Amino acid sequence: MARASKKTARGRAAPKLAKVGRGELVTLIDYVRYSVSRFNEAKLAFAHGTTDPVAEAAFLVCEALHLHPDQFEAFAHARVTAAEGKTLLDLIHQRVTTRKPAAYLVNKIYMRGLPFYVDERVIVPRSYIGELLDSHFGGDGEAGSLIDHPTAVERVLDLCTGSGCLAILAAYHFPNATVDAVDISKGALEVAARNVGEHGLDERVTLHRGDLFAPLGDNRYDLIITNPPYVDAEGMAALPPECRAEPKLAFDGGVDGLDVVRRILRDAPEHLTPDGGLICEIGRGRELVDEAFPELPLLWLDTEDSEGEVFWIAAADLD
């Protein structure tokens, strides 16, 4: 009887990578080129901190060789040892055959230049909010700033914190603030706790397990940040294998993608200070959000790579 071929999670036969001969790949850039070719051949999806196969390949190569991504150019033509080459080929093979996000394979992702631990208990963070903290919350009379000064922010809430990366970025950005971070997932909070500890912020970032505002009592905040589940039913059905490897809970926003967003907007007024505000990421659903909440004067904030995916609303406009 013929042996059954190994299957992927989606039921297809797992792709096989041709054996690489000794000496065929020599330098870091050789392994990047080889990776890109295999990634393109396998039609991988890129949406987890990198947006193209070249950046993904460079990220994997650097992590495997214990290099910061910023160091790749300096070592691009350096030779790779035999042991390092085997490690790299194993990683490339895993990325192609498992379709897991690269960040899961190396247990790391970078946001705003800072490293964060990730594994399959959390969605791989790729929020625009970190960039917006820098561009719209600088104060000091900066054009477009939504606050007077970062030091004036005393309490921040991060809803649906996942790995805790946004809570940590907020703690760095607002030096006088304490940060509460909430998630319903026990596993996610375990990952967040590791990240908070590794960044030395245990005294300033407090983790809470619960459903949105439920564990917070009557606490009020100067700023609420959230990147909640916002994928609609149609989008959930079309997720690529890389996204299906992540926790479904972190994506699923209900039929129209707004189940969690509605609850946040409904309850946020009870947890904001009079001069506070809410910043919320909703993906590419701006038109739907505007139609669902025509009475709200939402301010849509753009970044270098996004347009109309994050909104701001002041506490006074939510009452």
Curated annotation (Swiss-Prot):
It is an enzyme of class 2 (transferase). One of its GO terms (molecular function) is protein-glutamine N-methyltransferase activity. Pfam families: MTS (PF05175). Keywords: Methyltransferase, S-adenosyl-L-methionine, Transferase. GO terms for cellular component: cytosol. InterPro entries: DNA_methylase_N6_adenine_CS, HemK-like, Ribosome_uL3_MTase, SAM-dependent_MTases_sf, Small_mtfrase_dom. Its EC number is 2.1.1.298. It catalyses: L-glutaminyl-[ribosomal protein uL3] + S-adenosyl-L-methionine = N(5)-methyl-L-glutaminyl-[ribosomal protein uL3] + S-adenosyl-L-homocysteine + H(+). One of its GO terms (biological process) is methylation. Methylates large ribosomal subunit protein uL3 on a specific glutamine residue. HAMAP family: L3_methyltr_PrmB. Belongs to the protein N5-glutamine methyltransferase family. PrmB subfamily. This is Ribosomal protein uL3 glutamine methyltransferase. It comes from Bradyrhizobium diazoefficiens (strain JCM 10833 / BCRC 13528 / IAM 13628 / NBRC 14792 / USDA 110). The lineage of its organism: Bacteria, Pseudomonadati, Pseudomonadota, Alphaproteobacteria, Hyphomicrobiales.
